[in-house]
């Protein structure tokens, strides 16, 4: 683990948070973030990186999942999702009404009807979750405003627990609907193939509508699988790209430039300073900020002289930042991370609150 080799425990107790502790009432859009995501667990099993770097990648995977869910329930995406599925429901209804004279040799009409009902159920789930998120956000903002006026402490933990329960129920319903849709797709594919030319001749409109629905599902399934593979490869091989992406879409969860200026800044000096571009055991020499030296010189062991974000060893002269929890990283790497999330990527220590994020 990238930690200082001397007096790390005592130094941790002496460090105070950059800012005084504050209540954070923001409810994470992903209530399941308290548990490792499937992608994070998979990364932990298939990659060969050592433990600290794997922790960073699992944290990045959870952050990416939270961003994905937040983006998935944004107004434009929800509107597009509802309109798309509503169009499928409308197409199913119009086709079922307009083809009453067709007599297919397979129960393809039943398949189209159930397919439309599944789309409608998906619309209900998406809208209910979107409405719940907006209602919770408005209620929380109003409660926070009122409680600030009257110095009343708001029970954010209870609010988060209630929302987690509701979110879990919606997720279970969506998962069940996805499984049923997959099974129903297989049944529809079988009926279309079994019907063959006879189905095409007796009910051409129903046949082609079924083929279109099946093709749409295949397209989205392939797209999601390819996207998940690309994200997994990026997390394993190019974490800085993921951090840059998260930083580009980050909200207000990170730290400001003024808060970053409080962090101790070091320059790594290899023990064999007469050789250039050498990596390995060395020491962290503090760099004065505004004429003040905020830290003391630290010695690093060989296994600690690398950055767990970019997986690169510290080169002689590299600038490093150290967090109050004693973990250290390349300055450029950790600055991008902290602007996205105000927690240590290894131990989840929140540099604003002075506490460890248990999620």
Curated annotation (Swiss-Prot):
Q: Which InterPro entries does this chain map to? A: Znf_RING (IPR001841), Znf_RING/FYVE/PHD (IPR013083)
Function according to Swiss-Prot or TrEMBL: Probable E3 ubiquitin-protein ligase required for embryo development.
Taxonomic classification: Eukaryota, Viridiplantae, Streptophyta, Embryophyta, Tracheophyta
According to UniProt, this protein's pathway is: Protein modification; protein ubiquitination
The biological processes this protein is annotated with in GO are: embryo development ending in seed dormancy; protein ubiquitination
Q: How does it sit in the membrane?
A: Multi-pass membrane protein
Knockout phenotype, as recorded, reads: Embryo-lethal phenotype. Embryo development arrested between globular and torpedo stages.
Q: Where is the composition biased (Basic and acidic residues)?
A: 10-25
Q: What's this protein's name? A: E3 ubiquitin protein ligase RIE1
Please, which domain of life does this record's source organism belong to? Eukaryota
The cellular location(s) given in this protein's UniProt record come to: Membrane
> What's the chief localization of this chain?
membrane
EC no.? 2.3.2.27
Citing just one GO molecular function, the answer is: zinc ion binding
Annotated catalysed reactions = S-ubiquitinyl-[E2 ubiquitin-conjugating enzyme]-L-cysteine + [acceptor protein]-L-lysine = [E2 ubiquitin-conjugating enzyme]-L-cysteine + N(6)-ubiquitinyl-[acceptor protein]-L-lysine
Record the organism.
Answer: Arabidopsis thaliana (Mouse-ear cress)
Query: Zn fingers (RING-type): where?
Result: 307-348
């Amino acid at each position: 683990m990238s930690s200082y080799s001397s007096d790390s425990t005592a130094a941790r107790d002496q460090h105070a948070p950059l800012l005084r502790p504050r209540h954070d009432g923001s409810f994470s859009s992903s209530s399941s973030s308290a548990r490792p995501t499937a992608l994070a667990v998979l990364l932990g099993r298939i990659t060969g990186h050592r433990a600290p770097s794997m922790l960073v990648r699992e944290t990045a995977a959870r952050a990416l999942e939270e961003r994905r869910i937040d983006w998935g329930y944004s107004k434009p995406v929800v509107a597009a999702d509802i309109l798309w599925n509503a169009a499928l429901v409308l197409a199913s209804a119009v086709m079922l009404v307009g083809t009453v004279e067709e007599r297919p040799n397979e129960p393809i009409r039943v398949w189209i009807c159930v397919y439309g009902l599944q789309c409608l159920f998906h619309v209900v789930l998406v809208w209910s979750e979107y409405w719940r998120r907006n209602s919770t956000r408005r209620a929380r903002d109003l409660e926070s405003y009122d409680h600030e006026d009257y110095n009343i402490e708001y029970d954010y933990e209870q609010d988060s627990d209630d929302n987690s329960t509701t979110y879990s129920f919606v997720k279970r319903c969506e998962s069940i609907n996805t499984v049923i849709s997959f099974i129903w797709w297989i049944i529809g594919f079988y009926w279309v193939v079994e019907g063959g030319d006879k189905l095409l001749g007796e009910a051409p409109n129903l046949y082609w509508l079924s083929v279109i629905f099946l093709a749409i599902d295949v397209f989205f399934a392939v797209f999601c699988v390819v996207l998940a593979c690309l994200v997994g490869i990026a997390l394993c091989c190019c974490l800085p790209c993921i951090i840059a992406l998260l930083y580009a879409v980050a909200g207000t969860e990170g730290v400001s430039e003024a808060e970053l200026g409080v962090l101790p800044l070091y320059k790594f000096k290899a023990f064999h300073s007469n050789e250039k571009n050498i990596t390995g055991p060395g020491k962290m020499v503090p760099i004065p900020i505004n004429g003040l030296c905020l830290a003391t010189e630290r010695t690093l062991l060989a296994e600690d002289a690398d950055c767990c974000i970019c997986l690169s060893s510290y080169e002689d002269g590299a600038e490093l930042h150290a967090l109050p929890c004693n973990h250290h990283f390349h300055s450029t790497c950790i600055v991008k991370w902290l602007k996205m999330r105000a927690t240590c990527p290894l131990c989840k220590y929140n540099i604003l609150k002075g506490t460890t994020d248990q999620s």
